[in-house]
Regions:
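Bacterial N-terminal signal peptides
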Residues: 1-6
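Cell wall/extracellular polymer interaction/catalysis modules
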Residues: 8-84, 89-93, 101
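Exported/periplasmic cell-wall-interacting domains
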Residues: 47-51, 70-201
């Protein structure tokens, strides 16, 4: 009887993540209820975020991309802002990997992490979030947490049209009062996050 009770508690306490590419939103769920909803920027066309059922494979607070970043010259000026690691680097220059803080890998090289949200899908396949949301997701998930990615990535014009709509697929009234804290309510529009002080891809 005790084992059954523990199993029920475990199921009820299960944390999961849903990523809606159409709405450009990520949802943190506990017991099937949304406890936190974050705007995102997923993979752009040519680098679309793959849909499917995954699990968190790795967590790393100070992760850097091994494939993407920028190239600077000997004076530190940016030569290529959106560079691949195998691009030619000018003499005296260097390749600087893109920072991906609070990284939660869930599919190959793709994961959720803190990053710049320009207001439309813009990444190389990862799911960017405003930093305060990435921290909350990072602290709530574990290796093995289910991640479901669904929906169709909108074109830029269509997405910007949707951003004026009050419709969201999920009810975003927070079931967990901790996430109703004003610290998780950014002082900017829900679809846009300003660039942080550090450079982001």
């Amino acid at each position: 009887m005790l084992n059954l009770f523990c199993a029920i508690v475990s199921v009820r306490a299960e944390t999961s993540v849903e990523i809606d590419l159409q709405e450009q939103m990520a949802y943190l769920l506990r017991d099937g209820r949304t406890i936190l909803a974050s705007p995102i920027s997923s993979g752009r066309y040519g680098h679309l975020t793959q849909t499917g059922s995954f699990k968190v494979l790795e967590k790393e607070r100070n992760h850097s991309s091994s494939m993407y970043g920028k190239i600077v010259d000997a004076s530190g000026n940016t030569v290529v802002a959106d560079a691949d690691a195998d691009m030619r680097v000018p003499g005296g220059g260097k390749f600087i990997p893109a920072p991906m803080h609070y990284f939660m890998r869930f599919n190959g090289a793709d994961g959720m992490h803190a990053g710049y949200l320009p207001g439309y899908p813009a990444s190389h396949g990862c799911v960017r979030m405003p930093e305060q949301y990435a921290i909350a997701f990072f602290n709530s998930v574990s290796v093995g947490t289910p991640v479901t990615v669904f929906g169709r990535t909108p074109t830029t014009g269509r997405y910007l049209g949707q951003s004026r709509s009050p419709y969201f697929r999920r009810n975003t009234r927070f079931a967990d009062p901790r996430f109703a804290d004003p610290r998780f309510r950014p002082p900017f529009g829900p679809r846009f996050a300003p660039p942080p002080g550090a450079w982001w891809p």
